Curated annotation (Swiss-Prot):
Pfam families: SQHop_cyclase_C (PF13243), SQHop_cyclase_N (PF13249)
Catalytic-site annotation from UniProt: 400 (proton donor)
Gene (name only): DCD
Family annotation (SUPFAM superfamilies): Terpenoid cyclases/Protein prenyltransferases (SSF48239)
Enzyme class: isomerase
Summary of the function given for this chain in its UniProt record: Squalene cyclase producing the tetracyclic triterpene dammaradiene.
Lineage of origin: Eukaryota, Viridiplantae, Streptophyta, Embryophyta, Tracheophyta
GO biological process assignments: triterpenoid biosynthetic process
InterPro entries linked to this entry: Hopene-cyclase, SQ_cyclase_C, SQ_cyclase_N, Squalene_cyclase, Terpenoid_cyclase/PrenylTrfase
Homology family: Belongs to the terpene cyclase/mutase family.
Protein name in UniProt: Dammaradiene synthase
GO-annotated cellular components: lipid droplet
Keywords: Isomerase, Repeat
């Protein structure tokens, strides 16, 4: 299944060529009005008849590799186009032999091991040149012993890694009340969705026979017979503590003394069945779906069982199948894409009652979630009313999507305005109730910040909790500012209370870095976080935050890719930040190439700062706009191969295929609005 018209994006792997980044009409760029019109036309051409927009959500090859492994475990590989998946995996291999976490990262060990395993399961012999190169890469990086926990779990399921090297998750964890310190509800929903099925899997420790039978002994740098069968130490006292606890759990397992074992397993099974959507999804994201199906297989569910069949159908919905390749996405993003496209089209001048926008608005209204989900365990007084990221995910609405949808709906004129306003009011109440104690907002839960959980042996990705973040907190505050700016006719009680806004502003001020930037959790990285914070502060409290706004704007100007500001890297007037800035803060705002989406974010931040300060960085903004104009393609789109979406910093990134479209259109539209109002002067040619 292909989201939107893929023909434009199939470009013989220009995707992996950094030199094509930003390739467009450099010699004859369109005018500002022409670029905006072309972009509008392009986006309108991508709308589905039902009213939504939906583009590919590209990740790394891990998701596709896991799908190969799963279907081999289930023995139904003939139900998936495995030959096309092999072609995809082969194409994604880099010249050094590894597979990458994001384009240009030099290869990543765990991604490479999982891709190698998938190809071997697809009957590719170890003597194949591609696998010989991959094996050398793996051994040079330390082999299986240095890979992440999820990689080791996959190998353990195939009998190729010792279960003693996998942490224990005693089933009685399922019986802990929601308020308990180590309850499953103290973990982030994405972690929770993996922990619950893995409680069953870790208890049963299954080994599945697959065809062809493989050992993968060659992946152990030290030889499998010498491989360490205990959990690795991380060097701090918490690591020592949890490993000691794990040894106790394992000793109890060997002695057959596991309290409430069967009860806990039944509760885990019940929990999963309750949360499976009618469409088959578990939480709407790939890892919980993968482990939930493995859990069902472990519990004895047949492949023909309706629970399993529905789940397998959802895997196919996550697939991108082309003429000769097939890959799998980590999730689907129609609500997110639709809301952001709607905002960009209205901002750029499309009438709020345009038929395409009305269809989108009606579709969004249908997707509001009015039933309580997992979020209510820590927010029992909240009124349900948020939106989720996906087509269906009723248990897990999120704050980011909800705030963006509210802003999108607010700028539309729909046939039934009362229904629209009622939906917005309900969502505002929910968002207000989700504010965390520290003043910020998180993605899915309230006060989900027990950071000690990240020290458990299971959490080598350090993503077990869902704390407040700058970008989501800023989005909520931007929403409040936009509603008031548009003169939306809600009672003051329907907005966030003044004390909540004040606490949110204190949180944003506290999170600002010394350089003036803000960290970005869900977009790469400091450019994203800084843009969000500047937009929010300029809308909600510009007079009392002039210093913070000025510092943020100065930082954006300093990291722009312009001659005289940078010795190395591009000097094209755009902005670009590498995913490596999560590994090394010294790379804040730095990158090898400029990108359309990150340039758009920077422009939004600078324009907002100019509104607040009464003075715009005209030269910097002008160069950024010129970069976008000169890189637009003839059909009105922008090409971007870089990963600018956040998943799990350092461990998983995303490339939203519409980010280079709607964010860019919004930025150009905001620039034009200020030109027309004579707030900003055009740059001197």
């Amino acid at each position: 299944m292909l989201p939107y018209n893929q023909d434009f994006y199939n470009e013989d792997e220009a995707l992996k060529d950094d030199h094509c980044e930003g390739a467009g009409n450099v010699s004859n760029p369109p005018t500002l009005d022409e670029a905006i019109k072309r972009s509008q036309d392009f986006l309108l051409s991508q709308q589905y008849p039902e009213g939504y927009w939906w583009a590919e959500l590209e990740g790394n090859p891990t998701i596709t590799s896991h799908t190969v492994i799963l279907y081999k475990i289930l023995g139904i590989e003939d139900e998936y186009p495995m030959d096309k998946m092999e072609k995809y995996l082969r194409r994604m291999q880099c010249i050094h032999g590894g597979w990458e976490l994001f384009y240009g990262d030099g290869g990543q060990l765990s991604v490479t091991i999982e891709s190698y395993v998938a190809l071997r399961l697809l009957n590719v012999p170890p003597t194949d040149p591609a696998l010989k190169k991959a094996l050398k890469f793996i051994i040079d990086k330390g082999g299986v012993x240095k890979s992440r926990m999820f990689t080791k779990i996959c190998l353990a399921l195939l009998g190729c890694f010792d279960w003693r090297g996998i942490p224990s998750l005693p089933p009685w964890v399922m019986l802990l009340p929601g308020w308990f310190l180590s309850s499953i509800y103290e973990t982030a929903c994405w972690a929770r969705g993996c922990v619950v099925p893995l409680i069953v899997v870790f208890d049963k420790k299954p080994v599945f026979k697959v065809s062809p039978e493989v050992s993968f002994d060659e992946l152990y740098a030290e030889g499998r017979e010498h491989a360490c069968k205990t959990l690795p130490f991380c060097g701090d006292w918490t690591s020592h503590f949890f490993i000691a606890v794990d040894r106790v759990f394992k000793m109890m397992e060997r002695l057959g003394v596991v309290p409430f074992q069967q009860w806990g397993i039944r509760e885990a099974e019940k929990w999963l069945l309750e949360r499976q959507e009618d469409t088959g999804d578990f939480l709407g994201v790939y890892p919980p779906m993968f482990y939930s199906v493995v859990c069902m297989k472990t519990l004895g569910y047949e492949v023909t069982d309706p629970v399993v069949r529905r789940a397998l159908l959802s895997f196919k919905k996550f697939s991108i199948e082309r003429a000769d390749e097939c890959s799998v996405q980590s999730s689907l993003s129609p609500v997110w894409d639709t809301a952001l496209v709607v905002r960009s089209l209205v901002e750029s001048g499309l009438p709020p009652d345009h038929p395409a926008l009305q269809r989108a608005g009606e579709w969004l209204l249908q997707k509001q979630i009015t039933k309580h989900g997992d979020w209510s365990f820590k927010n029992q007084s909240g009124v349900a009313g948020g939106w989720a990221f996906q087509f269906f995910n009723r248990w897990y609405p999120d704050l980011d999507d909800s705030a963006v949808v509210v802003m999108a709906l607010d700028c539309l004129k729909l046939p039934n305005e009362d229904v629209k306003n009622g939906a917005i009011t309900r969502c505002l109440k929910w968002i207000s109730s989700m504010q965390c104690k520290g003043g910020g907002w998180a993605a899915f839960d309230k006060d989900n910040h027990q950071h000690w959980i990240n020290s458990t042996p299971f959490s080598d990705l350090k993503a077990m909790v869902d704390p407040s973040t700058t970008d989501i907190s800023a989005r909520v505050l931007e929403m409040v500012g936009r509603l008031k700016l548009h003169g939306t006719s809600f009672d003051e009680a329907h907005f966030l209370p003044p004390e909540s806004i004040a606490r949110g502003l204190v949180y944003l001020r506290r999170e600002q870095e010394n350089e003036g930037c803000w960290f970005g959790r869900w977009g790469v990285n400091y450019i994203y976080g800084t843009c969000g914070a500047l937009v929010a502060l300029s809308l909600v409290a510009p007079m009392t935050h002039e210093e913070e706004i000025a510092r943020g704007a100065r930082w954006l100007v300093q990291v722009q890719n312009m001659h005289g500001k940078k010795i190395n890297g591009p000097q094209d007037g755009g902005w670009g930040e590498t995913c490596f800035s999560y590994n090394d803060p010294a790379l804040k705002g730095q990158g090898d190439v400029s990108t359309a989406s990150q340039t758009a974010w920077a422009l939004q931040g600078l324009l907002a700062a100019g509104d607040a300060l009464g003075k715009y960085e005209v030269e910097s903004i002008g160069h950024g706009v010129q970069y976008l104009l000169s890189t637009q393609r003839k059909d009105g789109s922008w090409h971007e191969s870089q990963f600018t979406g956040g998943g799990f910093p350092i461990h998983f990134y995303l490339r939203y295929h519409f980010y280079a479209q709607h964010f860019t259109l919004s930025s150009l539209a905001r620039y034009r609005t200020r030109l027309q109002a004579s707030k900003i002067k055009p740059p001197i040619p």
